[in-house]
């Protein structure tokens, strides 16, 4: 595992990997990454990017199930602490129970559920605070787990689309379109989201 910053050479290596287009976009716009190579090819990466320190991990399919994700994340957490970064944020699909459990064991807090659009369905926003500032932010963001808070988040997220790349290291033009109507017409607390998933597993 190694921490790297984005260079032209790294961009080329990432583009030659088999990462999903969405994850690749995040990596290319990140502040720094932790990567794992095999035979000089990148087989796993974990990125941090944007004002909100957006964080995500992807491992090439044939190398999944080997514990690489946790090792990459541990490397990122160590680097964040060295750089005095206050928190990491991420988004999970509720159906990805293994990833949710892994991240909550590390210290990630589940903040709220947002209904993105008909195709993407609902997503869970999470945060990993490192210090008092991060913990304060986590408490503040829990407001979005309320009905009125969820509505306000949907409004803010809709208005922030032109600035998304700077906020979460992802170009809004490449994102699936956020459906404001769908978001405000659906709501459930994050605890209910997890409970619903458990019923079907």
Task: Please identify what each model-predicted range represents.
Residues 30-44, 201:
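Conserved beta-hairpin
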Residues 1-26, 139-143, 150, 154, ...:
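Short amphipathic alpha-helix that is part of the acyltransferase structural core
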Residues 49-61, 91:
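Conserved acetyl-CoA binding element of GNAT-fold acetyltransferases
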Residues 104-114:
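Conserved acetyl-CoA-binding loop of GNAT-fold acetyltransferases
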Residues 90-100, 118:
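Conserved beta-strand-loop-alpha-helix junction that forms the acyl-donor binding cleft
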Residues 80-94:
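Conserved GNAT acetyl-CoA-binding A-motif
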Residues 59, 65-78, 105:
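Conserved acetyl-CoA-binding loop-helix of GNAT-fold acetyltransferases
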Residues 30-31, 121-127:
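Short hydrophobic/aromatic beta-strand or adjacent loop that forms the aromatic wall/cage
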């Amino acid at each position: 595992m190694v921490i790297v910053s984005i260079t032209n050479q790294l961009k080329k290596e990432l583009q030659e990997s088999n990462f999903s287009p969405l994850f690749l976009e995040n990596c290319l716009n990140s502040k720094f990454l932790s990567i794992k190579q095999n035979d000089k090819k990148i087989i796993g990466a974990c990125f941090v990017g944007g004002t909100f320190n957006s964080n995500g991990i992807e491992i090439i399919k044939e190398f999944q199930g080997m514990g690489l994700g946790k090792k990459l994340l541990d490397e990122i957490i160590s680097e964040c602490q060295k750089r005095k970064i206050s928190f990491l944020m991420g988004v999970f699909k509720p159906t990805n129970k293994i990833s949710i459990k892994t991240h909550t064991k590390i210290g990630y807090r589940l903040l709220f559920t947002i209904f993105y659009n008909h195709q993407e369905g609902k997503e869970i926003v999470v945060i990993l605070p490192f210090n008092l500032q991060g913990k304060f932010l986590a408490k503040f963001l829990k407001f979005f787990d309320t009905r009125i808070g969820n509505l306000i988040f949907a409004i803010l997220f809709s208005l922030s689309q032109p600035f998304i790349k700077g906020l979460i290291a992802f170009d809004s033009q490449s994102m699936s379109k956020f459906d404001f109507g769908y978001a405000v017409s659906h709501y459930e607390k994050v605890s209910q989201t997890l409970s619903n998933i458990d019923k079907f597993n």
